[in-house]
């Protein structure tokens, strides 16, 4: 895994009186409402596929985060019911989904057909509970790549540390059989002596993690995210999946304007 340089420590020692302006909207962690953002960073993770070619990469994002409408490289979302401060907010969104790979992505998928990422259309409900938010969602493939859906619930809790905001989160998600079998199943024609044919059914996965948001000034901020996902057995038992335990660590620098 590629090592990621985290340079938060020195800044924290110097001290900072700025507020991080963190909030939850349409199931996402945002800062600086009503501004544009440009973000760059890197991530490292455990291998999802056995003998995966690489498990690190760049994190790039650019977009606008408004009061109701948000658009960036991760997708589009719009709050169509409720206002900031209301107990219930409802939204709709478009987002990229799936695990794109081909036979060059890992030794375990040599000779298999290419799997493509897709775009999902979804509905989201945010329920405010003090400094916490329960966020539920349902999304379905609209490009007919995997023909499946995902649904789940996450809990976010914003903790003001004075110099930074810490947002722990936890959730449970369900991936349909069509989704799981497209990405983690092995067709009869793809089976080999080392890779048996496999049908993946629908299953639950669980996640736990945090995001730390540290403002350098009113324009610049540093974020650091760590997350753990426990894959359901229908995914984990696939002959091409490396482990049920998946970790991800990332860090970014963002500029708001």
From Swiss-Prot:
Its main location: membrane. InterPro entries: MipA, OmpV. Transmembrane segments: none annotated. One of its GO terms (cellular component) is cell outer membrane. The keyword Signal applies. Keywords: Cell outer membrane, Membrane, Signal. The keyword Transmembrane helix does not apply. GO terms for biological process: peptidoglycan biosynthetic process. Pfam families: MipA. It is found in: Cell outer membrane. Belongs to the MipA/OmpV family. This is Outer membrane protein OmpV. It comes from Vibrio cholerae serotype O1 (strain ATCC 39315 / El Tor Inaba N16961). The lineage of its organism: Bacteria, Pseudomonadati, Pseudomonadota, Gammaproteobacteria, Vibrionales.
């Amino acid at each position: 895994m590629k090592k990621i340089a985290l340079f938060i420590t020195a800044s924290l020692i110097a001290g900072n009186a700025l507020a991080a302006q963190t909030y939850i909207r349409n199931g996402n962690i945002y800062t600086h409402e009503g501004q544009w953002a440009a973000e760059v960073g890197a991530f490292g993770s455990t291998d999802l596929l056995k003998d995966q070619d690489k498990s690190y990469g760049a994190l790039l994002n650019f977009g606008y985060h408004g009061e109701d409408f948000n658009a960036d490289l991760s997708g589009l979302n719009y709050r169509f019911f409720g206002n900031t401060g209301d107990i219930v907010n409802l939204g709709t969104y478009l987002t990229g989904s799936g695990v794109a790979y081909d036979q060059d992505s890992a030794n375990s998928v040599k000779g298999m057909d290419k799997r493509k990422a897709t775009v999902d259309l979804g509905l989201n409900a945010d329920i405010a509970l003090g400094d916490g938010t329960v966020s539920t969602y349902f999304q379905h493939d609209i490009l007919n790549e995997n023909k499946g859906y995902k649904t789940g619930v996450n809990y976010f809790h914003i903790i003001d540390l004075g110099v930074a905001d810490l947002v722990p989160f936890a959730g449970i998600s369900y991936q349909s059989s069509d989704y799981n079998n497209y990405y983690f199943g092995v067709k009869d024609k793809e089976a080999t002596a080392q890779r048996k044919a496999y049908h993946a059914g629908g299953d639950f996965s669980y996640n736990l993690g945090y995001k730390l948001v540290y403002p350098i000034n009113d324009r610049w901020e540093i974020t650091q995210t760590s997350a753990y996902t426990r894959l359901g057995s229908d995914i984990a038992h696939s002959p091409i999946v490396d482990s049920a335990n998946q970790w991800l660590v990332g860090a970014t620098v963002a500029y708001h304007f």
